[in-house]
């Protein structure tokens, strides 16, 4: 491998490349745009485009694309060659400021939730200069926002940038009140931990459910799953290690800060975590990471599964969204310092986040709602569907002392003593970790743990940014009119924390007692996507988005429609796949096995009537019963699907899908899995869980 420092970012048009390629004044103008959010001069765009093209051609690129993130949850791109024809039959290689700054993809073929009709095809992509352009497979990719002809956001990047703008505005107001005149920008930094499964490609291809839906719709429990807890942080297998090495190289070339890799809890499950970066860049990088994971896995004869629950009975995959607030002067506003009880600025931002999560706990749940994630949340492997905040012992004691107006007694930091003289002593952290909390403070950041592994991080961060911005706005309004700043800050912190103590929970989120306690506290428990999504369009939430200029009412309603429709379609596809596998694979296999068992019984009788065939008869009886059960359950599922009212209200259709279709699917699976336990291995038409989870 090349020298890592030389390898890193070689396929990204990053700051060092800009400095090298751009005239000094052009570079300064572009940096002002990136760092201060100023509009870009069209003349500057032309110079940047030309430098970008020359660099891309030297790196072997032949095409360029406006790379964007529509509301499908995956990325989109249309490739155009740099060539322009000349009269003599030759071509000129061109790429100007207009091509860099703006594109015009068809907007009618992407999900719009009613924002665009099929005949209203014009849409625009607009360059996001804060996220570096990069070269992928011979194409110069320019990160862009995507909007309609009328200016409505049709993507995930536009609202994220709007929410960053709102948060920056309100956070700076707070900083100015604390006398900070140096900071020009406040921005969220995020590091998303990405979980995934790896399975052998040939084994995967023999599982039509995995191929079509991303998860197994049938599968009996294997003899060994994750019971021994020996996979987590275990020795990485050579084939997986080779994949990880290749993945790191690909990510580093693009300037993605891949940092940590390890085995996760479930067999064949792993994790990759990057270093923090600005949230819109982190979102772009995470989308790229998921795409590259799949391609690198394919090169290694494997398939990377990003579904939240590919296998029943072992842990699913999530994505921990580590969230902090930083200034352009390098200050982390969520760092409590050595004496958090005396750090008023930290306590203002902390109390703002606590209030935001409490006031908009419904939106926090909406942000992570999907058919796939419903399998994880609250299943003793992921945080519960009830949103709460874990702060740890030290911060909890500080907050209680503020609320109760009592004196906080600071504790001296203990030293870790391991009972072995040769081992070093080191300061013990002020709090333990709580893996059952959906939103946990972990020293100098919050970790939002409810995200599903396949989802874009943009949506959850839009909601976090917007809710925090709104709370900071109210705080700034109150403090700016205060006569005595110190007294006003103390009173504001106490009032805010007192009003939102219910959202703080430091206990076991998996415990059923917490469900009852949360209900007493008035916290929402929204176990499924269908329960959560109506809150997206609640009047208070639409008002929030409009107040912070992140979404219009129409944009919120469109996202509600898209998420609801996606939920219905995903489960319909799973149901149809369940029927197909049952009828064309499992039932024929069970019948063929039953036929051979029956033939064995008859053969015994004909050869030696005195020979007993009790085992065969019992097996045949069980086979027949389970085969009949599967046949009937499959027919019921088909009838349930046909009975669904296509003309019904979207919410009613979603409720029908959740209550009827999923229940009918579960019955088919139960019968199919029972048959897997008794049908001979050589007859079974698909690789088993044991085959899949030990295939790499």
PLM segments and residue spans:
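Gly-rich Lys/Arg/Thr-decorated short loops/hinges at beta-loop-alpha junctions or inter-strand turns
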Residues: 1-14, 33-35, 223-232
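Catalytic pocket of metal/acid-base enzymes, prominently hydrolases
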Residues: 1-27, 41, 122-142, 442, ...
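Active-site core of metal-dependent hydrolases
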Residues: 7-120
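Active-site proximal loops enriched in glycine and acidic residues that flank catalytic Cys/His/Asp
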Residues: 44, 68, 96-97, 262, ...
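Hydrophobic/aromatic-rich, well-ordered segments within soluble, folded domains that form packed cores
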Residues: 57, 61, 65-69, 283-299, ...
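Short linear, low-complexity motifs centered on an aromatic residue
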Residues: 73-88, 108, 207, 214-216, ...
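Glycine-rich, acidic/polar active-site loops that bind/position phosphate-bearing ligands
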Residues: 121-306, 315-318, 325-561
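C-terminal amphipathic alpha-helical interaction region
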Residues: 493, 498-696
């Amino acid at each position: 491998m090349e020298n890592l420092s030389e390898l890193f970012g070689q396929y990204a048009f990053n700051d060092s490349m800009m400095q090298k390629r751009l005239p000094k004044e052009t570079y300064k103008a572009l940096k002002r745009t990136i760092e201060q959010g100023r509009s870009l001069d069209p003349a500057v765009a032309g110079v940047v485009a030309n430098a970008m093209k020359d660099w891309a051609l030297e790196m072997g690129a032949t095409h360029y694309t406006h790379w964007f993130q529509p509301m499908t949850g995956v990325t989109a791109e249309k490739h155009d060659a740099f060539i322009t024809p000349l009269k003599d039959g030759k071509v000129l290689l061109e790429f100007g400021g207009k091509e860099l700054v703006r594109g015009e993809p068809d907007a009618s073929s992407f999900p719009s939730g009613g924002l665009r009709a099929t005949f209203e095809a014009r849409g625009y992509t607009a360059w996001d200069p804060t996220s570096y352009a990069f070269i992928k497979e011979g194409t110069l990719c320019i990160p862009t926002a995507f909007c309609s002809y009328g200016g409505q956001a049709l993507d995930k990047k536009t609202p994220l940038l709007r929410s960053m703008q709102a948060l920056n505005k309100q956070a700076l107001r707070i900083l100015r009140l604390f006398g900070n005149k140096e900071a020009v920008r406040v921005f969220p930094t995020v590091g998303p931990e990405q979980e995934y499964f790896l399975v052998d490609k040939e084994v995967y291809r023999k599982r039509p459910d995995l191929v079509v839906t991303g998860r197994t719709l049938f599968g009996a429990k294997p003899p060994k799953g994750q019971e021994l807890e020996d996979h987590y942080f275990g020795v990485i297998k050579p084939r997986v290690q080779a994949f990880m090495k290749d993945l790191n190289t690909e990510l580093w070339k693009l300037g993605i800060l891949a940092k940590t890799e390890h085995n996760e809890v479930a067999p064949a499950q792993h994790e990759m975590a990057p270093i923090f970066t600005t949230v819109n860049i982190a979102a772009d990088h995470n989308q790229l990471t998921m795409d590259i994971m799949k391609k690198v896995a394919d090169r290694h004869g494997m398939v990377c599964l990003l579904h939240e629950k590919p296998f029943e009975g072992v842990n699913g995959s999530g994505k921990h969204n580590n969230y902090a607030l930083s200034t352009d002067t390098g200050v982390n506003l969520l760092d409590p310092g050595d004496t958090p009880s005396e750090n008023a600025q930290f306590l203002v931002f902390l109390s703002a986040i606590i209030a935001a999560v409490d006031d908009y706990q419904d939106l926090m749940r909406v942000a992570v709602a999907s058919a796939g994630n419903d399998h994880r949340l609250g299943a003793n492997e992921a945080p519960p569907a009830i949103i709460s905040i874990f702060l740890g012992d030290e911060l909890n004691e500080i907050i209680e002392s503020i609320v109760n107006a009592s004196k906080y007694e600071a504790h001296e930091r203990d030293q870790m003593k391991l009972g072995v003289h040769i081992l070093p002593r080191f300061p013990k952290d002020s709090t333990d970790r709580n893996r059952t909390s959906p939103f946990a403070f972990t020293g100098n950041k919050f970790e939002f743990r409810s995200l599903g592994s396949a989802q874009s991080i943009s949506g959850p961060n839009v909601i976090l940014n917007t809710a925090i911005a709104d709370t900071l706005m109210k705080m700034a309004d109150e403090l700016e009119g205060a006569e005595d700043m110190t007294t006003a800050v103390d009173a504001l912190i106490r009032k805010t924390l007192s009003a939102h103590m219910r959202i703080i929970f430091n206990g076991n989120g998996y415990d059923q007692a917490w469900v009852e306690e949360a209900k007493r506290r008035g916290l929402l428990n929204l176990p499924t996507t269908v329960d959560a999504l109506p809150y997206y369009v609640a009047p208070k939430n639409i008002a929030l988005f409009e107040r912070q200029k992140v979404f219009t009412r129409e944009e919120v309603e469109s996202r509600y429609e898209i998420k609801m429709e996606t939920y219905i379609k995903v489960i319909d596809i799973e149901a149809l796949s369940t029927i197909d596998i049952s009828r064309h694979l499992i039932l024929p296999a069970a019948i063929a096995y039953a036929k051979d068992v029956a033939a064995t019984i008859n053969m015994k009788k004909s050869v030696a009537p005195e020979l007993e065939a009790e085992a065969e008869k019992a097996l045949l009886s069980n086979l027949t019963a389970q085969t009949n059960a599967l046949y009937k359950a499959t027919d019921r599922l088909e009838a349930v699907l046909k009975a669904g009212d296509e003309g019904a209200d979207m919410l009613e259709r979603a409720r029908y899908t959740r209550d009827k279709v999923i229940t009918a699917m579960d019955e088919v699976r139960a019968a199919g899995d029972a048959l897997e336990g008794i049908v001979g291995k050589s007859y079974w038409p698909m690789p088993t869980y044991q085959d899949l989870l030990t295939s790499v």
